[in-house]
Structures are given as structure tokens and as C-alpha cells.
Amino acid sequence: MSKRGRGGSAGGKFRISLGLPVGAVINCADNTGAKNLYVIAVHGIRGRLNRLPAAGVGDMFVATVKKGKPELRKKVMPAVVIRQRKPFRRRDGVFLYFEDNAGVIVNNKGEMKGSAITGPVAKECADLWPRIASNAGSIA
């Protein structure tokens, strides 16, 4: 029986190490007023019994704001991971990791709620999300 998946299509997402399981608290790197994001669920994870769903760079996840403006707190919203501490391998063989875990708040279409991103954005994320790439200060 064949495995389900993207089938390695051109322009598809390359498999990277997933460093942010459900329950992780990460920095919010945009100017929406949120300080950190709490990972509730990860989009597109089918899962396995007793395995926590986890997100990596470029993954969309469901989040809540734990610290930040009161109008953003206690609401469920989508977000995208732009940096992760866990090393992940690029196609050219280099292993890359960042000094923090960070994400940005988006809408369901992937358009950013804020208008600026602090710090670098991973190239893998910028390739998948053009609206995030356009607001990125630097792409690493």
C-alpha cells in the first residue's frame, strides 16, 4: 500500500525536522502587539497514537496569545513558524538553526495580520508564504 503525501511535487514542502510540539510557547515576531504564541494544533498533521503533533519552519498552526495586547489574548488564531531552534537540513546538505523559536500571526489565507517582522525569516518559510516574505527584513 502506498503512503499518502505530497508525492514530492515541484514547489512542495521539503520535509524538515519538527521542533515545536503542541504546548510550545514561541516568540511572536510581528508588530501586532502579541509577545508570544502558544501552539494548540498543527495544520495538516494526521498523526499517530500518543504522538504529539509538532510544527517546523513554514508550518501553519493554531495559536493563542499568552502575553500581549488584551484584544489579542484568549482568541484562537492561525500562525506560521518562521524560525526554530531545532537544526533542520537543507537540500544542499547544510544544517541550519536559529537562536529562538518564532512565529507570525496570519489569517486563513496566509496573509499577515501585522506589517513588519523582527529578525530573519527562514528561506523555507519565505518560499511557501509570499506574504510573509514580502514583510521580512531578512531571509536566511
From Swiss-Prot:
It holds the Pfam family Ribosomal_L14. GO terms for cellular component: cytosolic large ribosomal subunit. The keyword DNA repair does not apply. InterPro entries: Ribosomal_uL14, Ribosomal_uL14_CS, Ribosomal_uL14_sf. The keyword Ribonucleoprotein applies. GO terms for molecular function: large ribosomal subunit rRNA binding; structural constituent of ribosome. One of its GO terms (biological process) is translation. Keywords: Ribonucleoprotein, Ribosomal protein. Belongs to the universal ribosomal protein uL14 family. PANTHER family: 50S/60S RIBOSOMAL PROTEIN L14/L23 (PTHR11761), LARGE RIBOSOMAL SUBUNIT PROTEIN UL14 (PTHR11761:SF8). This is Large ribosomal subunit protein uL14. The lineage of its organism: Eukaryota, Metazoa, Ecdysozoa, Arthropoda, Hexapoda.
